[in-house]
């Protein structure tokens, strides 16, 4: 298992596969599988039968994609970037965009 550099709420772009170029926010992270669910990406329609708990019908939902197929969006330029970890003067560890040096995520706000 690899160290994940993604968190819920991060802005990412798909860099490979059928959904290449689509942007979205991370809705859920599955660290044990190294997969994430991104809003508006890998959307499928599922046909469900009616039962006592719910009605039947067609529902749309996002399926997980592997983290190797996504890249963070640089907050400064808006382009895909790699992520590094950096320690600030106060000793806190933050995620930084390698291209611009901007802090990524809630730590930067």
From Swiss-Prot:
Disulfide bonds: none annotated. PROSITE patterns: RIBOSOMAL_L24 (PS01108). One of its GO terms (cellular component) is ribosome. It holds the Pfam family ribosomal_L24. The keyword RNA-binding applies. GO terms for molecular function: rRNA binding; structural constituent of ribosome. Keywords: Ribonucleoprotein, Ribosomal protein, RNA-binding, rRNA-binding. One of its GO terms (biological process) is translation. InterPro entries: KOW, Rib_uL2_dom2, Ribosomal_uL24, Ribosomal_uL24_CS, Ribosomal_uL24_KOW, Translation_prot_SH3-like_sf. The keyword DNA damage does not apply. Belongs to the universal ribosomal protein uL24 family. Part of the 50S ribosomal subunit. HAMAP family: Ribosomal_uL24_B (MF_01326_B). One of two assembly initiator proteins, it binds directly to the 5'-end of the 23S rRNA, where it nucleates assembly of the 50S subunit. This is Large ribosomal subunit protein uL24.
């Amino acid at each position: 298992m690899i160290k994940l550099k993604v968190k819920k709420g991060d802005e990412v772009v798909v860099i490979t596969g059928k959904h290449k170029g689509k942007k979205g926010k991370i809705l859920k992270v599955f660290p044990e599988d190294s997969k994430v669910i991104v809003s508006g990406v890998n959307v499928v329609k599922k046909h469900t039968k009616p039962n006592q708990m719910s009605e039947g019908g067609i529902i749309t939902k996002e399926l997980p994609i592997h983290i190797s197929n996504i890249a963070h969006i640089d907050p400064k330029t808006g382009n895909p970037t790699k992520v590094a970890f950096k320690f600030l003067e106060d000793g806190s560890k933050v995620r930084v965009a390698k291209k611009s040096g901007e802090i990524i995520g809630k730590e930067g706000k």
